[in-house]
Amino acid sequence: MASYAVLGATGNCGSALIQLLLQRPDASIHAFCRNKPKLIGLLPEIEKSERVTIYQGSIKDTDLLTACLRGRRAVFMVLSSNINEPGFRVGRDANKAVIEVLRTLHREDSGSTGPPPKIILLSSATLDDTLSRKTPYLLRQILHMSASHIYNDLAETEKLLRAEQEWLTTVFVKPGALSVDEQRGHALSFVESDNPVSYLDLAAAMIEAADDTTDKYDMKNIGVVNTNGAARFPTGTPLCIATGLLRHFVPSLHPYLP
């Protein structure tokens, strides 16, 4: 049975991943979250599913995280935010915890159960010159500033994971804008990312990268493109950009912004 862990299960990407994995009868899913009732509210079918185990708690709970990651083939790291919170470091903290747990498990197993699980990290095309080359320069700068604290966390997270590449494999999935919309069809790309892409298409792309056995995506930056039309424009984007810019230029306003 194909075994996966989803960290950040209650987010748009995490819930989309679980939704698609549930369609596969061979998938075993460990869902890590801080709020189990919220996750069940999003995906009621998982409450009685024998193929889904929910781990509720803090990413700093080493025993809980170890139980979640043990025996997994791939780990989807989809912990992020749409709020440009000053000092944001969820990605760094979570990935440090995951690296330490996987290192311990790797030493305990001594390779007897195969390589460590592959990390599939949700990042952003805005951080990659090639994948975002179709985005006008000025717009890209605005987007970067509007999520500067989040992107700084992502950049540092990527450094952490690349420093472990001798024993731990990561695929860096970098979509453009994301939208809550239906699944239309996707393709993985080394040279571009479309705007916008639905979370379901992003999730399908991440699963494809996790299941690849050729290693062609390992340690690479991967974009996601639409194959059957673009997703709907996310209507909350203008407000998200505006409040993100305020948090970038005047961080002290953060507690007072939506």
Curated annotation (Swiss-Prot):
InterPro entries linked to this entry: NAD(P)-bd_dom, NAD(P)-bd_dom_sf
Family (UniProt): Belongs to the avfA family.
Keyword list, A-Z: Monooxygenase, Oxidoreductase
Organism ancestry: Eukaryota, Fungi, Dikarya, Ascomycota, Pezizomycotina
Induction: Expression correlates with the formation of the sclerotia and thus the pigment production.
Species this chain originates from: Claviceps purpurea (strain 20.1) (Ergot fungus)
Catalytic class of the enzyme: oxidoreductase
Molecular function (Gene Ontology), one example: monooxygenase activity
Gene3D superfamilies xref list: NAD(P)-binding Rossmann-like Domain
Function: Oxidoreductase; part of the ergochrome gene cluster responsible for the typical purple-black color of the ergot sclerotia. The ergochrome gene cluster produces several ergot pigments including the yellow ergochrome secalonic acid and its derivatives, as well as the red anthraquinones endocrocin and clavorubin. The pathway begins with the synthesis of atrochrysone thioester by the polyketide synthase (PKS) CPUR_05437. The atrochrysone carboxyl ACP thioesterase CPUR_05436 then breaks the thioester bond and releases the atrochrysone carboxylic acid from CPUR_05437.
EC numbers for this chain: 1.1.1.-
Highest taxon in the source lineage: Eukaryota
Protein name as annotated: Oxidoreductase CPUR_05430
